[in-house]
């Protein structure tokens, strides 16, 4: 059965994310593993001048395959334009939330086979990361001469995300002073 479109899972229109029942993976059988496996790429030991990050402006859920698509787009652009040793890229969210689907059949005679809304809890079909306004999703650290390439890479990655997002640039020297 094909995957449902992202609009089915992206926005939670009911009350705030109070949390559905039974979300711990050790209690849910058959949770598919997330497609995204690598969360850190590039050179983590470099001396960088800027942090460029993509943050969302609305609350919602980002599915694991959207995170993987954004990661691949950003990593491919950065590695081909500035090289693997000139940046540090990190995905800042993890898809903990388990998505379920109550499968419905749509063919002749399906009413004899399916239960309708009886026992409609659903089977796990994927995972998603829950995000809130202002939360960073992707982060790249670069030197000043590669700042424009980092912005373009994150613009390409942000186009793969289902929520409206923006890019912010943080000078790293000021952030170190604020943390101290």
UniProtKB/Swiss-Prot annotation:
Q: Which GO terms describe its biological process?
A: translation
What InterPro entries does the database record attribute to this sequence? Ribosomal_uL16 (IPR047873), Ribosomal_uL16_arc (IPR022981), Ribosomal_uL16_CS_euk_arc (IPR018255), Ribosomal_uL16_dom (IPR016180), Ribosomal_uL16_euk_arch (IPR001197), Ribosomal_uL16_sf (IPR036920)
| An example Gene Ontology CC term for this record | ribosome
Q: Does the keyword Ribosomal protein apply?
A: yes
- Gene Ontology MF annotations: structural constituent of ribosome
Which domain of life does the UniProt lineage start with? Archaea
Query: Gene3D superfamilies given for it?
Result: Ribosomal protein L10e/L16
Q: Which UniProt keywords apply?
A: Ribonucleoprotein, Ribosomal protein
Report any Pfam family annotated for this entry: Ribosomal_L16
Tell me its family.
Answer: Belongs to the universal ribosomal protein uL16 family.
Q: Which NCBIfam families match?
A: PRK04199.1-1 (NF003236), PRK04199.1-4 (NF003239)
Protein's UniProt name: Large ribosomal subunit protein uL16
- Organism field: Hyperthermus butylicus (strain DSM 5456 / JCM 9403 / PLM1-5)
Q: What is the lineage of its organism?
A: Archaea, Thermoproteota, Thermoprotei, Desulfurococcales, Pyrodictiaceae
């Amino acid at each position: 059965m094909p995957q449902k479109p992202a609009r089915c899972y992206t926005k939670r229109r009911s009350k705030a994310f109070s949390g559905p029942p039974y979300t711990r993976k050790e209690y849910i059988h058959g949770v598919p593993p997330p497609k995204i496996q690598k969360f850190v790429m590039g050179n983590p030991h470099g001396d960088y001048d800027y942090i460029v990050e993509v943050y969302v402006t609305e609350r919602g859920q980002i599915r694991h395959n959207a995170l993987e698509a954004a990661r691949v787009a950003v990593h491919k652009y950065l590695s081909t334009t500035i090289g693997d040793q000139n940046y540090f890229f990190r995905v800042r969210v993890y898809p903990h939330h388990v998505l379920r689907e109550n499968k419905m059949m749509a063919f002749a005679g399906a009413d004899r086979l399916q239960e309708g809304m009886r026992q409609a809890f659903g089977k796990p079909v994927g995972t998603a990361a829950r995000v809130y306004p202002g939360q960073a999703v992707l982060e790249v650290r670069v030197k000043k001469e590669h700042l424009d390439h980092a912005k373009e890479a994150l613009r390409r990655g942000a186009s793969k995300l289902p929520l409206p997002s923006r890019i912010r640039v943080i000078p790293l020297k000021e952030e170190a002073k604020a943390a101290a």
